[in-house]
Curated annotation (Swiss-Prot):
Region Disordered, annotated ranges: 522-577
Keyword annotations of the record: Nucleus, Transcription, Transcription regulation
Cross-referenced InterPro entries: AtrR-like (IPR050987)
An example Gene Ontology CC term for this record: nucleus
Subcellular location: Nucleus
Organism of provenance: Penicillium herquei
Biased composition (Low complexity): 523-547, 563-577
S-S bridge residues: none
Stated name of the protein: Putative transcription factor phnE
Record GO terms (molecular function): DNA-binding transcription factor activity
Biased composition (Pro residues): 548-559
Lineage: Eukaryota, Fungi, Dikarya, Ascomycota, Pezizomycotina
Amino acid sequence: MSGGAISIFGELNAHTYLGKAFFSSINYKIHQWPECRRRLGRRLMGPAQAAGPGKSSVDERNPNAAAATEINTNASIPLLQRECESFDEIQDRLTMMQDQLSRLTATLDNKQNLVDRVDQIGDKQSSMPTPPSTGHVVSDVDGQIQRYHGPWTLLAQCRQLESDLASWSKADHAAEVASLVTSMVQETMRVPSSSLSSFHTEIPGMGMCLPPRQLLSVMVECFLKNADYATSIFDHQSLYCAIDRVYRDPSNPEEKPWVLCFNLIILLTLGAEHSLQSEDPFVRPMLQAVQTAAGNSRLLMEPRLVSVQALALFSLFMQQCYPDNEPLGDGIFAQACVLARQMGLPQPHGYAATPSTLTAAEVDERHRVYQSLYIRNRYATTTSGALMWLPNSIMCTGTASAVGAHWELAKLQDEIHRVLGSCSFGSSDRRIKVAQLREKLRVWQEACLVAETQPMSMDRVILCLLFLGTRIYISMDNKETDTESFLDDCRLSCLLLIVSCTKHLRPDFSNQFHHLLRRLNPSRRNSDGSAHSSPSSTPSSSSTSSPLPSPASERPPPLDVVTRPSTGTSTPSSPTLLPLPRLANAFPITAIFILARHILGISAEGKPINTHRTVTEINSDILLLESLLFCFQNNPPFLGGKDQTLHCSYKLGQVLDHLVRIVHTMTSDRTSPRAHASGLPLVTEHAEMTDYMSRMFMTSKGSPASDLTGLWYPRDVTSDTPMELSIPDFQSVWPTPQDSLASSTNPLATAEGSIYTPALHPTPIIPNTPLDLSELFGFTNSDASEVWNLGTETTDLLENRRPSLKRQRTHFESQ
């Protein structure tokens, strides 16, 4: 029991003791009241009545005695009045004590409800299938470095699964499962000692240098055009002015944060299309500049707006380069938030202490920076349990149209965290608050998720993933983990990643994907009719009598309400895949653990679930997790190198690898994708596909589940990837707009428009590996390093070869 409840009990007992003593005195006075009344009566009646009838009460011969009797009678009247007033005071005190006892009782009831929720005793709200609310503190081998992992982080989820599986007592596989779980937890706790220096060789004599101005001009145009909630942190005119100022005086040490920003803009823009190679002669100098900036504490500690912007881009770059080392990017992001608070960016309208010194453009840019940091912080808290570094947004008004939907969702997530993380609400108040939050989330969904984005855009997929992650977060807190809609949110989250990052898709996954999208949109679900609204039409359903979703030829474009009109005849073309690093940061990590528990038939605390599950549903979910694992393994990293290991570079992918192996071990005797040999059906339409998929994902107990490259695929069935099935008349789930077919370049992922938006004509065609732009700027590989030398001769040479920023921008506008 908490200390507050104990103090309330003590106060109540004290008041009870005092009340008993007071009531005892009242009872004594009540018992004494008849005797007092008799004494008063005798004094009022006088000596005559006291002597008996027939006797005179006043001695006529003694006038002094008569006067004394009158005095005694007059003196008795105030005494009677005082006695009556004392009883009125007693009644008032009784009323006051009754009110105090009522308040104490109500306070005690509220404290008892709080104790029940915290201690998980007797209250339904207490049995939450979540990790311990205190989280985990992990130390390194020497105990010098300690890191806190909150209750929704990846490590906490692994620890919770370890606790849930501890009660699983299957004798033939218990030891193997325990070993796999321990390995998963240890892998999650391990923090690699990766740094920028481990991915490239340092160039002697080259520090933090400016990139070629012509390259920067091209990349800045693409960067600003494709800016999203994470990169929309610059005022365009201010950025162009900074470029002119820095290149006029490149040796000014005060402009070093801008030099870091320029290099990061190029790296992030190039990495949005292709995996960067650390050995590339053009990428190496930019990585060298970033590494030099990382060692300059003064550069990243000064409370300047450009320092916050540089840290914001730096953290985004590190999170994509090193997805297996979360503290590396999270620490840089935390420093950006600390500087933002020191500068007063969370204040209304971005003002500082003296708002008159800021222009309208500066106010807008400060607000952009704060919005971007705030959105990223709330998104990370919802999807992966990151710490909150920025205060809430109650005092902030207005938002840029480019990030309006993200801004509103982030504010809604902030409200959700405050409500679900508060202990001041009772059970009934909490349910009312949660219902109100669900309604607000539904309103946001109808306003922002349906009609305001284009098919296959990076921004749209991220919005959908974050919306699903928010709904999963609310359902997890309210113990709604067995409902079909909750499981469908987890399945759709996995399918969004698979569809966005995989060339081809299994037809049953494609049907399930479109059906879940239709159910996600209430207006579309109602318009499609009751025939398609049944949850049994998904491959994971327990019933097969309901009709399947409409065929591929009749489906609307995914994540879009209205089909855009065609501008011409189309030709077959593979859809452009989205980069996994950005999508992985928006993926709700809880989804894979929920599906794994559903497959294994356990809930939190290791208890069996009551939901009816079919073999078809279990097999479908297993294949879904395996397909997601292959998606993590098959996608190239954001930054690669010749010495890079072949294992999955994503921490979530490594955990998913262990999770799939645990599922295989625990379901080997019941059902799994390799159980077709025992006659159990799989979720495929033909026997040939059943045999293929069972061999595709089957792993021996002696080899890790992540080693999918070593599986025995028949060469007459497989193609480039295990999921590239040769299916006639199979239509890709993502439509290819006509405007993408005429472009000769691979476009960058757009934030507001389609991924297929053609790139600018001056944008160079970036080869896969290595990245070589020497022909574009008129020099060979041998003298490529001279580009980054800011000496007088080299600078003059480059100025003769590249146009000025003003002429370059005029050239873009003419295009």
